UniProtKB/Swiss-Prot annotation:
The keyword Chaperone applies. This is Urease accessory protein UreD 1. One of its GO terms (molecular function) is nickel cation binding. It comes from the Bacteria. It comes from Brucella suis biovar 1 (strain 1330).
Length: 280
């Protein structure tokens, strides 16, 4: 008989999650099509059948979540004239860390005349989780982009409360080789107390950042503000020939956040609208 206790396990190293997914999209024969697809480890990419409109890709982490020491990488590139909507099968879950941080690194590249929408579902952080998330975007002049990243600290409906965690979120967005948007957001280790601060979240446990870059982003400003309401804000800048629309949303829980985030994404994503997996 084998008896397992803490002494038996102390010298063992846990299996780590490693996943890499790479997707390149081209415009050929009147449609946006796959030109390259690479999948490794826990990262999988699936494409629902679409006859018209942008290519839709659904990212899947087959491990079901991440914890300390896990690594997940996504790389998406659009060639001239292509369009794509990238989303995830489900919310990404970041579980309690037994040591080290979970890392999610995303790189997006969009050539001239492309339209790229990066629309993952929420990332949920559990108590004592540690996450480092990085987003790097390279846009050529004339490319259009919509990016959404939503983060939830615990699921209130499940009675979950995040008291301690660490979260680092780094964004770098370049247009024509020039940085037009940069973020360095950090929370922790006392996340529960920090979220209560009026200058941070005012007690909210769910938040989202939305970034749109295109020549006509300004036409959505007033409608976006009406959707956002008082729990958030929306600003507009000129960046060369393009405009940059930045939205911040916060809410007491993920359900309240989605009630405004979903119509906002549907507005900003044009004819492509809201990804179907968001409503399942």
């Amino acid at each position: 008989m084998l008896i397992i206790n803490d002494n038996n396990l102390s010298g063992l190293s846990l299996q780590r999650v490693n996943g890499t997914g790479e997707l390149s999209v081209q415009f050929k024969d009147g449609r946006s099509r796959i030109s390259r697809l690479y999948q490794e480890g826990a990262a999988k990419i699936r494409m629902p059948q679409a006859v018209t409109g942008p290519l839709e890709a659904i990212l899947i982490n087959t491990s079901g979540g991440l914890t300390g020491g896990d690594r997940l990488k996504w790389d998406v590139a659009l060639d001239d004239g292509a369009s794509a909507v990238i989303t995830t099968q489900a919310c990404e879950r970041i579980y309690r860390s037994g040591g080290g941080e979970a890392r999610i690194a995303t790189r997006l590249k969009a050539a001239k005349g492309t339209r790229l929408a990066w629309l993952p579902q929420e990332t949920i952080l559990f108590n004592r989780s540690i996450l480092s998330r990085r987003l790097d975007v390279e846009l050529e002049e004339g490319a259009q982009m919509l990016v959404v990243e939503a983060t939830v600290f615990g699921r209130l409906a499940m009675g979950e409360r995040v008291v301690a965690a660490r979260f680092a979120d780094r964004w770098r967005v370049r247009l024509g080789g020039r940085v037009i948007h940069a973020e360095e957001f950090r929370l922790g280790p006392d996340v529960g107390a920090e979220l209560q601060a009026p200058a941070v979240a005012g007690g909210a446990c769910a938040m989202a950042t939305v970034l749109m870059v295109c020549e006509q982003a300004g036409r959505h400003l007033e409608t976006a503000r009406a959707i956002i309401g008082e729990e958030g804000g929306c600003s507009l800048w000129r960046v060369g020939k393009a405009s940059k629309l930045v939205v911040r949303l916060y809410a007491p829980d993920s359900y309240a956040l989605r009630r405004r985030l979903c119509p906002l994404v549907a507005l900003l994503n044009g004819k492509a609208g809201l990804p179907k997996v968001w409503t399942i």
